[in-house]
Amino acid sequence: MKRVTSLLATVAMVFSVMVCSASAQAAGKLVVGGKGYTEQLIMSSMTAQYLAGLGYDVDQRDGMGSTVLRTAQLNGQVDLYWEYTGTGLVTFNKVVEKLSPEDTYLRVKALDEKVGLIWLDPSQANNTYALAMRKDFAKEKGIESISDMMEWLQSEDGKDAQMASNVEFSARQDGLKSLLEAYEFEMPRRNLRKMNSGLVYQALSQEVVDITMVFATDGRVKAFDFYVLKDDRNHFPNYALTPVVRQDALAANPELAAQLNVLSALMNDTTMSSLNALVDVDGLSIERVSRQFLEQNGLL
């Protein structure tokens, strides 16, 4: 009987150690996701380096599309990534009513909490969509706003104009389709050229196209001295860059929310645009730009 009791005690102790070890491992390991363009690659790299420096076991998985990444997080394959409030609200939750930046954040935060995704503090970086033209060309045509552009496209002078768009913008609920609906315009297929996100800036700069969609915080907008058209009907929602984390990951890592909020507080339009430009204009590596930023801010 004593041998049985001793054996049971030993088994219980081993099991307890295994459970504690497994819990510690789960609590310390995080999968950081990201999309496939510069800003997202910077943020996933920066977050992975930052968390690794804090002692977490980090697995970085980026280069995904928006829908694939969202699905991976919902399925528990990704613990956290940086999403945009407008994308979360319109694309994932199908809310199309016009809301203020604050209400956009509060609404998507409340909706996603129901599916176990927690939106932490939003940054001041608003990577909204925009339309841009070469500054001299826009001035020549007297175009200042999207309405001016739409009017020009219907004229004899502008009927053959070419617009560049990446594939995602042309397909998204909050992209080209809703833009054209908001401005009551039908764009013939011959006027639209779909291409990789990185090529739209070159296409406009090299006069291959006359108009292009851009991301507001992309460093190439300033580098190429493009003119960003006024969204005079306030169509595009706010796209505040925000860390979104699985509720289970936050529960397993009590300090994680505060740690990510520190990083979020450092991001604004100017900072994000500058970081993007270091990669896309100056040719520095994603890892180097991310590490330098962390070091400069005492986070690494």
Residue ranges, per PLM feature:
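A conserved helix-loop-strand patch within extracytoplasmic ligand-binding domains
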Residues: 103-162, 265-269
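An extracytoplasmic/periplasmic, membrane-proximal ligand-sensing/linker region
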Residues: 39, 168-185, 255-300
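Ligand-binding "clamshell"
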Residues: 92-120, 208, 220-234
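Beta->alpha turn/N-cap motifs
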Residues: 62-66, 76-89, 104, 197, ...
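A bilobed periplasmic-binding-protein/Venus flytrap-type ligand-binding module shared by bacterial periplasmic
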Residues: 129-139, 240-253
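Short, polar/charged alpha-helical segment
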Residues: 38-57, 73, 180-181
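Extracytoplasmic "Venus flytrap"
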Residues: 29-47, 62-68, 168-171
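Ligand-binding pocket segment of bilobal, Venus flytrap-like solute-binding proteins
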Residues: 157-231
